A protein has these predicted regions:
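Conserved N-terminal subdomain of the carbohydrate kinase-like
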Residues: 2-120, 267-275
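Glycine-rich beta-alpha junction loops
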Residues: 15, 42-44, 86, 112-114, ...
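Conserved phosphate/ATP/ADP-binding segment of small-molecule kinases
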Residues: 120-203, 234-237
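Short, small-residue alpha-helix embedded
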Residues: 148-149, 213-236, 240
């Protein structure tokens, strides 16, 4: 008898144009034979990275009502995976999901900033709200900027792997498993990587050659592969390696000159993910 697919509740924004957030998370997890139940924190005409001011639809009452409906139906979630929140109050929505499904594997991608700055449009109350949410997670996946924001450290420029590893270790006081992404100061800047840490365990690092192009949405693809691989039984380090390799493959499958704001050509790379 074939085992039923694992089921993930993905609490993220849904952009219509541009490959990011739920528009890449759903196909990635489906390719990994993981069912995704999408709970949009906002519906946007585009993602928020360089495509102008998107049209936005937000319904604060929808999320809590949807969770209660799923709970009444007896839906079982193996994982709850959150990302972009439209405002600090939405952290309560994710916490509600954690409380309704306490046995689910809880993953938080603390979307706060990148490139050494807090994302525009996020209020000062978002950092403490995200910190509180991370403290209730099993695994958090910040980039180097978000790691600094969560820890109250100076915002980084190009950090070293050693600095990121120290931050990851400190963040295990917040959540038991941590993966810090976007570490660029590796091998004289020739590589980009991630560092992982587990409470009471040894740290690890994964690197891939640094690509000269920077696409929006690759962090969402990375985290989705990471979640999918863990749910399929991979240990975190192996899941991180698979996620980093697939992001590199997505970039290779995207032609030179493609508009980086629109994200990688995920459609070309998904068959490779299914084969792995």
């Amino acid at each position: 008898m074939t085992n039923a697919p694992k089921t993930v509740l993905a609490i993220h924004d849904l952009p219509g144009f541009g490959r990011a957030a739920l528009s890449v998370i759903v196909p990635v997890l489906s390719t990994l034979s993981v069912q995704t139940v999408a709970l949009p924190t906002a519906v946007l005409s585009t993602h928020t990275g360089g495509l102008g001011t998107p049209a936005k639809l937000a319904n604060p009452g929808y999320g809590p009502a949807a969770l209660e409906h799923y709970h009444r139906l007896g839906v079982k979630f193996d994982c709850i995976y959150s990302g972009y929140l439209a405002d600090a109050a939405q952290a309560k929505l994710v916490e509600q999901a954690f409380e309704l499904w306490p046995r689910a594997f809880k993953v938080v991608d603390p979307v706060l900033g990148d490139g050494g700055r807090l994302y525009s449009g996020l209020g000062a109350d978002m950092v403490p709200a995200m910190y509180s949410l991370c403290s209730k997670a099993d695994l958090i996946v910040p980039n180097v900027t978000e790691a600094a924001l969560l820890l109250g450290d100076p915002l980084p420029g190009v950090g070293s792997a050693e600095q990121a590893a120290a931050q990851a270790a400190r963040l295990t006081r917040v959540a038991p498993q941590v993966v810090v992404t976007g570490v660029t100061g590796i091998g004289g800047g020739r590589y980009i990587g991630c560092v992982g840490a587990a409470r009471g365990g040894e740290g690890y690092a994964v690197k891939t050659p640094l690509q000269p192009r920077m696409f929006h949405g690759t962090g969402d693809i990375f985290a989705a592969v990471l979640v999918g691989r863990i749910l399929r039984g991979n240990v975190p380090q192996a899941a991180v390696q698979a996620a980093a390799a697939f992001v590199a493959e997505c970039i290779r499958q995207t032609p030179e000159g493609a508009d980086e704001r629109l994200g990688v050509w995920l459609e070309n790379a998904l068959p490779k993910l299914r084969q792995e």
